[in-house]
Amino acid sequence: MKLAPVKVSKDRIIRTVVGLRPFRPSGFRVEKEKIGEKIVVHNYGHGGGGITLSWGTSHIAIEELFRDDPPRGKVAVLGAGALGLATARLLQRRGVEVTIYAKDLPPQTTSNIAAGQWSPYFVSEFSKRSPRFKEQFARAARLSHRHFQNLLGDYYGVHFLMNYVLSDYPFGRGESGEESLDDLFPESRDVPPGEHPFPVKHVRQYVSMMIEPPVYLEALLRDFLLAKGSIVVRELQDISELQLLAAMGWLESPDALDRPRRFLGAAREAPGDVLRNDVL
């Protein structure tokens, strides 16, 4: 195995970013609720898997919205990050008229500073997962993976990439009772010593998708506007201002901020004037 060395040094860092990740120990919340005369579908608390699970949990959220009593008017979506835009596009594909209400738009969203690796992990504490959540999580991961496969290419900034995980200790085999998602990571194998150039005892390789948030989010926003979607840049003070609501305002949800996870990233120089986000 021959790999080009990664040129990394402090003097090549051009930007450092920090963002909160809305972590809930029990996992994300996708749930339909009626508040007064308003129908609200919550979809928040994805921890470090927001972009990864965005299409899957948004798919489930829209199923909830259409169950029993499908919307007969306009639908409002809160937030213009990965979850809000995915939800808005899925609604448009169902012929629904959508307005996004957001405090910030790309490139100022929290999603813009995510690393963008497709990896459905760090979204909950294993000991606090309910059977219902385990089933919902696995379904969301598979749905999202399939949606992202349809977005491969330069337009959306989604590409397959080989990954290497390095460790001084043997890799675990996952939690018992969890549905395996190994089939979503092709070419996954443990690389024996002598077959890799890394100075560690254990190396695992696998292929996953990498999403470039600045490219991806701008493309989704462009698609939404081309499909005659509306955007209102504002902070909502009262839910009574909206009729039907798909709530993506996860960072303002008290239980999503119960134990927020901090994300630290740095942008470095790369050949060809391309920027890649590196998780530190």
Annotated model-derived regions:
Residues 5-7, 18-37, 111-113, 143-228:
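Flavin (FAD/FMN) cofactor-binding and adjacent substrate-gating region
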Residues 31-52, 57-59:
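Short FAD-binding loop at a beta-strand-to-alpha-helix junction that anchors the flavin cofactor
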Residues 49-56, 127, 132-143, 203-219:
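Short beta-strand to alpha-helix junction loop
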Residues 73-99:
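N-terminal Rossmann-like FAD-binding beta1-loop-alpha1 element of flavoenzymes
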Residues 83, 106, 264:
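Conserved Rossmann-like nucleotide-cofactor binding loop
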Residues 103-134:
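Conserved N-terminal glycine-rich FAD pyrophosphate-binding loop of Rossmann-like flavoproteins
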